[in-house]
Amino acid sequence: MKELEKYSTCLKCIDEFSQNLGIKKKDRTIFKMKQSENENEKCLVLENGSFESPEPWFVIDENDEIHTLLSLQSLKNILESLKQSQKENFELRLEKAIYQQIPVDFNDVWTVAMDEIKQKAQNGTMEVSIDLEKLISKIKQEHPNLFVDMQAMIEKVNQNERL
């Protein structure tokens, strides 16, 4: 009875996950992993679906843990998507850091920042570990002409008010 309960719980988890992926119940492939006579071998028994069904395929092991099977191409596509998302996220964070310092010409600051980042990457620093706000502040100190000098503008406005 407990076995059936655990299996039912596994199926509910697979249902939920499949729904999130947009896989219909009839298109799901589920295997049950069983111990074979040889202790170094396991047997996969097709419980639902077919070998032509879309990935991922689900495997329920002897401990009622759920595993998935993916083709190498699918895994590669997932990793490429993650890499692209990470790149876009990094670029958005860099863009935000630049705009917070009020650049005179965004593209000039972007170019200098990317050069600095490439240099850090060559020295072994991972892009994700770079503090972008700190980097842009450093660039602002080294190249003040690339940014609007707000202090000078405020002083100029104050001088004009006195006249």
From Swiss-Prot:
InterPro entries: UPF0763 (IPR019724)
Origin superkingdom: Bacteria
Family indicated by similarity: Belongs to the UPF0763 family.
The name this protein goes by in its record: UPF0763 protein JJD26997_0796
